[in-house]
UniProtKB/Swiss-Prot annotation:
Family listed: Belongs to the phospholipase A2 family. Group I subfamily. D49 sub-subfamily.
Organism (species): Hydrophis hardwickii (Hardwick's spine-bellied seasnake)
High-level lineage: Eukaryota, Metazoa, Chordata, Craniata, Vertebrata
Co-factor binding comment: Binds 1 Ca(2+) ion.
Protein name: Basic phospholipase A2 73
Cofactor(s) listed in the protein's UniProt record: Ca(2+)
Propeptide positions: 20-27
Keyword Metal-binding: yes
EC class of the enzyme, as a word: hydrolase
Amino acid sequence: MYPAHLLVLLAVCVSLLGAASIPPLPLNLVQFSYVITCANHNRRSSLDYADYGCYCGAGGSGTPVDELDRCCKIHDDCYGEAEKQGCYPKMLIYDYDCGSNGPYCKNVTKKCNRKVCDCDVAAAKCFARNAYNNANYNIDTKKRCK
């Protein structure tokens, strides 16, 4: 799925929640994007990571194409561990702050929220310390992710 499609889908979901008079819940995907932006000091859009390599974005398979893609695999595995603990990582929100050294979890006491916050902060910091290779954006996963 293209990043623009994800934004449209997100906008439709938020609109439907508003139309149903249900207060919109902050979505973890949106929060994770803010954590990423904090970690890289606004140098790269979080959307750049939505379709990178074999693991950044929806799904994931094969061998990561580089260290940045490996960050996404580790993040996927971390969410998998959270799910095994009975958590719903894509739905949970948490308190975090953006300090001079990047994002950090702030006053997160609930087990699941803490786990998800730790997963997201670790991934965002991993993204920030590894090089982004434009050649690994929007790759043919059927050919390169075996």
